[in-house]
Amino acid sequence: GEQFIAAGRMDNLSSVHASLEAMKKAAEEYQGKDILVMMAFDHEEVGSSSRYGAGGPILADVLTRTARALGANEEERFQMFSRSSCASADAAHSVHPNYVGKHDPTHHPIIGKGPVTKINGNQRYASDATTVALWEAACEKAGVPVQRFVGNNDVPVSYTHLRAHETPE
């Protein structure tokens, strides 16, 4: 029969596990010269703005120092950042029958029907037109169905402020 697991931090732990498995597979198959990076951040539940949260400086610091250690000059570092992409993994909630109004009426994620792309009109997630297209193309290539979650704009959403796309100084 089907089983359910309930535990604290399950969304974060499952995202880290899935990311590590994907990174291992990508590293085995990757033929390019660029560096594959996977970061796991802390403090998502309190806004991600701590030193070790996604809104903090640690990712930009690590990438900048890595580029410098590999001999990249400033222009090469800027080029590295401009050809980079980023995915943010988190658990999505399916529609709760008692809180249907918290979801956009046309986007209801269903448990077990594939990963969910989270979209918010106020840019509260790492998704935009480019990242959604890249993600959905990768899922299609892998034969993985994709769902979309669009938050009801009248209901605030929790989010991870991810600074990874910002070029460090």
Task: Label the predicted regions.
Residues A27, E140-Q147:
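Hydrophobic alpha-helix feature that most strongly marks membrane-spanning transmembrane helices
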Residues V150-L162:
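Small/polar glycine-rich anion-binding or flexible loop at a beta-alpha turn
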